[in-house]
UniProtKB/Swiss-Prot annotation:
NCBIfam families: PRK08881.1 (NF006477). Coiled coil: none annotated. It comes from the Bacteria. HAMAP family: Ribosomal_uS14_1 (MF_00537). Part of the 30S ribosomal subunit. Contacts proteins S3 and S10. One of its GO terms (cellular component) is small ribosomal subunit. One of its GO terms (molecular function) is structural constituent of ribosome. One of its GO terms (biological process) is translation. Binds 16S rRNA, required for the assembly of 30S particles and may also be responsible for determining the conformation of the 16S rRNA at the A site. This is Small ribosomal subunit protein uS14. Keywords: Ribonucleoprotein, Ribosomal protein, RNA-binding, rRNA-binding. SUPFAM superfamilies: Glucocorticoid receptor-like (DNA-binding domain). It comes from Hyphomonas neptunium (strain ATCC 15444).
Length: 101
């Protein structure tokens, strides 16, 4: 089980990223727009840099929904390899069958 503080910090980052997503996208579009003057594009870049650091989506870490483990994460199932093995052996993951040959 991951530290509760690490899980909560990641949840705060998710919320912050969602809150600033529209503003960030708007500023990015303005900064990349070649029809705007160089000065306006530069101002958009500066405003983008002023946004909270934790509002960037790449600061959010994929974590297991069950244990909070940050590594060995399966995106499709939103769980770590350890939780997947545990739940799979109990037959709680639909479509997952133990392999034998």
């Amino acid at each position: 089980m991951a530290k509760k503080s690490a899980i909560e910090k990641n949840n705060r980052r998710k919320a912050l990223a969602a809150r600033y997503a529209a503003k960030r996208a708007q500023l990015k579009a303005a900064a990349m727009d070649e029809n705007l003057s160089l000065e306006e594009r530069f101002k958009a870049r500066l405003k983008l840099a002023e946004l909270p650091r934790n509002s960037a989506p790449n600061r959010v870490r994929n974590r297991c929904e069950i244990t909070g483990r940050p590594r060995a994460f399966y995106r499709k199932l939103k769980m770590s390899r350890i939780a997947l093995r545990e739940y799979g052996s109990r037959g709680q993951v639909p479509g997952l069958v133990k392999s034998s040959w």
